[in-house]
C-alpha cells in the first residue's frame, strides 16, 4: 500500500517536511549555488530507486554521474537502469521533455515513484527578456508538472535559483508568485560558513521557520 509521502533519502529532511515528499504535489528547494540542492535531488532519486521504483530526472545544469555514483554506492549501475534522464538544452526543450515524461509515467518498466527537475529555472533565465511571456511559459511548465503529479500519484521535486528582491529587500526564488503558489512545500537552503542550513518556508501543515544545519558529504549530507 502506498504511503502519502516519499522519502528524500534523509531523515532530517523527511522530518522537516512532515514525513517526506508529498505525493500529488510539488516540493521546491531554492538557494544559492553549491548550497546542496542537487545533492538532495540525487539523494531522493536514489532512495526511490532503492525502493524498487523508477525516477524521471530532468536536469538542466549538467547531470553528474560521479555524484550519483557517490550517493548510490556500489549498486549505482543497477539503480541507474531505472533512472530516466532528460537533459534539455533550452527552455523550449524543457517544455517538450516535461510532456515526453508522461510516456514513461504510463509505460515505464518499473512504476515511476518520483519526478525531479533540477533546476526548474536555469533555462528560464535565458527567456527573461521576453517579460510576461517568460513567466507564462514557466507557469505552463509547472502546471504540467503538477498535473503529472496528481494524475500519477507521485511527488515532484524541483530546485530553483535565487535573486535579490529589491522591493522586499530579501533573497527570493525565481519565477514569481506563480511558482511559489504552485509549490505546496518550499525549503530554502543557505550557506553558513562550512555548513548549510535548511529552512522551511512554506508547508500546509508544518510551521514556517523550522530549520536544521547540515554539511555536504561524499555520500549525501550529515546533520550537525
From Swiss-Prot:
The keyword Kinase does not apply. Keywords: ATP-binding, DNA damage, DNA recombination, DNA-binding, Nucleotide-binding. It holds the Pfam family Rad51. SUPFAM superfamilies: P-loop containing nucleoside triphosphate hydrolases. GO terms for molecular function: ATP binding; ATP hydrolysis activity; ATP-dependent DNA damage sensor activity; damaged DNA binding. The keyword Ribonucleoprotein does not apply. InterPro entries: AAA+_ATPase (IPR003593), DNA_recomb/repair_Rad51_C (IPR013632), DNA_repair_and_recomb_RadB (IPR011939), P-loop_NTPase (IPR027417), RecA_ATP-bd (IPR020588). Transmembrane segments: none annotated. GO terms for biological process: DNA recombination; DNA repair. NCBIfam families: recomb_radB. Involved in DNA repair and in homologous recombination. May regulate the cleavage reactions of the branch-structured DNA. Has a very weak ATPase activity that is not stimulated by DNA. Binds DNA but does not promote DNA strands exchange. HAMAP family: RadB (MF_00350). Belongs to the eukaryotic RecA-like protein family. RadB subfamily. This is DNA repair and recombination protein RadB. It comes from Methanoculleus marisnigri (strain ATCC 35101 / DSM 1498 / JR1).
Amino acid at each position: 500500500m502506498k504511503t502519502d509521502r516519499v522519502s528524500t533519502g534523509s531523515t532530517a529532511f523527511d522530518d522537516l517536511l512532515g514525513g517526506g515528499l508529498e505525493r500529488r504535489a510539488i516540493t521546491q528547494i531554492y538557494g544559492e549555488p553549491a548550497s546542496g540542492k542537487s545533492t538532495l535531488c540525487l539523494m531522493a532519486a536514489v532512495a526511490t530507486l532503492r525502493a524498487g521504483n523508477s525516477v524521471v530526472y530532468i536536469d538542466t545544469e549538467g547531470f553528474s554521474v560521479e555524484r550519483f555514483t557517490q550517493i548510490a554506492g556500489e549498486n549505482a549501475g543497477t539503480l541507474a537502469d531505472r533512472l530516466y534522464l532528460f537533459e534539455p538544452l533550452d527552455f523550449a526543450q524543457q517544455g517538450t521533455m516535461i510532456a515526453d515524461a508522461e510516456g514513461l509515467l504510463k509505460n515505464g518498466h518499473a512504476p515511476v515513484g518520483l519526478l525531479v527537475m533540477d533546476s526548474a529555472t536555469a533555462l528560464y533565465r535565458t527567456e527573461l527578456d521576453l517579460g510576461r511571456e517568460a513567466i507564462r511559459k514557466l507557469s505552463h511548465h509547472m502546471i504540467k508538472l503538477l498535473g503529472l503529479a496528481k494524475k500519477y500519484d507521485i511527488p515532484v521535486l524541483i530546485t530553483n535559483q535565487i535573486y535579490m528582491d529589491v522591493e522586499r529587500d530579501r533573497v527570493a526564488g525565481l519565477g514569481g508568485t506563480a511558482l511559489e503558489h504552485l509549490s505546496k512545500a518550499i525549503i530554502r537552503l543557505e550557506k553558513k560558513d562550512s555548513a548549510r542550513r535548511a529552512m522551511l518556508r512554506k508547508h500546509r501543515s508544518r510551521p514556517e521557520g523550522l530549520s536544521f544545519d547540515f554539511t555536504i558529504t561524499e555520500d549525501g549530507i550529515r546533520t550537525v
